[in-house]
Amino acid sequence: MNRLKILKENGHLIPVILEVPEEADSVVIMVHGFTSSKECPTGQLLIRRMPEAGMGVVLYDQPGHGEEEAKEDPFRIENCMDSLAAVEKYVQLKWPEKEIFYFASSYGAYLTGLYLERRKHAGTHLLMRSGAVIMPWLFLGAPGSEPDSEALEELNKKGYLMLGLTGTRQVKVPKGMFEDMMLPENDLYGNFGESDHGNTRVAMVHGEKDQVVPVKFAREFAEKYGLPITVFEGQGHSLSDDPTCPDKVADLAIDFFK
C-alpha cells in the first residue's frame, strides 16, 4: 500500500492511498461521503477485498475532508469534481491499460453522478452505495420547507457552518456550497437521466432503514432512471448494522464490476 499527493490546478493537494497490484486489470476509485475520508471503514473494506478479485484500489480525501491537506481545499461541488478528475487522470496516466470503476458512497455517489453528467470521464461502472440522491434537501431542507433562521443568521455572519452527521467529525461547509445546492443543474434527482452518462453503467445499493436518505427516494430514483438497485433489509445508512453486510456489499460490487 502506497501513499502520495496529487497536485490540483488550484494549488491544493489531494492525499491518496493506493493498492494496485501489477496484475490487476482494473482500478476502483472510491469517492467517500460527507464527513468521511479515505481512511474510512469502507476504504479498508475495498483494500481488503478488491485486490484479491483482480482490482486495484485508489482512496482519496475530498475537499474539506480528512486530516491532511485536502481539508484546506474549500468544500464546493466544482472543487470536488476537480479532485475526482485529478485522481482519475493520475490513474489513466499511471495505468493506461486498466479499466476504471467508481465506488461512491452517500454524498460521494451524488457528486459522482453529477460528474458523469458534466465531465469527460473514463469510468465504465459506478456503484452508488447509500447514494444521497436528494443531497440538496439534506443541506437546504425539503422543497417548500422553511430555512432554519438561526443557522441562516450564523451562515450569513460567518460565511460557513460546521456540520456533521451524528457520531462523525464536523466539516466546514462554506456559504458557497449552499449556493451550489440551490442551482438546478445540481439537482441529481431531477436531472440524472438527461444524458447516457458517457456509457457508464450505474447500479445502486441501499439500506432499507437508511435514516439519512430514506430508501423511498433511492427506489424512486432507481425506477425513474432505470437503474438496478439492491436493498439490504434492516440496514441503515452505513450498511453495517449487520457485521456481515459490508462484505455482502463488496461481493455485489465485485460482481457488478466484473
Task: State what each model feature region is.
Residues 25-33:
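Short beta-strand element of the alpha/beta-hydrolase
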Residues 35-47, 62, 216:
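The serine-hydrolase catalytic nucleophile loop
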Residues 103-112:
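Gly/Ala-rich beta-loop-alpha elbow adjacent to hydrolase catalytic centers
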Residues 34, 61-71, 132, 235-236:
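Short beta-to-alpha linker loops that shape the active-site pocket of alpha/beta-hydrolase fold enzymes
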Residues 1-21:
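N-terminal cap/lid segment of alpha/beta-hydrolase-fold proteins
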Residues 65-95:
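Catalytic nucleophile-loop/oxyanion-hole region of alpha/beta-hydrolase
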Residues 110, 121-220, 224-231, 236-257:
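The alpha/beta-hydrolase serine catalytic core
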Residues 47-69:
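Conserved alpha/beta-hydrolase
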